[in-house]
Amino acid sequence: MSDDAYSRLEAQFTEIGRLDDIRRLLDWDRATVMPDGGSDARGAQLETLAALRHRLVTQPDVARWLDDTDPGALTPWEEANVRAMRRMHLHAASVPSALIEALARAANRTEHLWRRARKDDDFSSVEPALGELLALIREEAA
């Protein structure tokens, strides 16, 4: 069962990695070429992506596959992968999906406001959103 469990984990986390790549591409686009009017739509996209990623990392099968892996049957590289997957799963499982979505929403809003504030040299306009984002980050860390 260990080989099958590891193969399933590898496939699952490959998909999660692709979602991370998509998020980075969307972030890059937002930072370089996206017009201001696209911020709300991009925020919704990033929020959906964060929720989907969270669901994939925390689904019950992942916990079962992690438990079913036999470290003795794995290469050192695979063992390191399983340790990283387990850390990712445990962290994600301890954070509610609603908080993940709220973080994505707040991060998008804060970045949009920051870009405008930087251009206008008006930090005070972004301060409330930044405070909200920091509060959510603290909640995630708790």
Q: What do these predicted ranges mean?
A:
Residues 1-142:
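A well-structured
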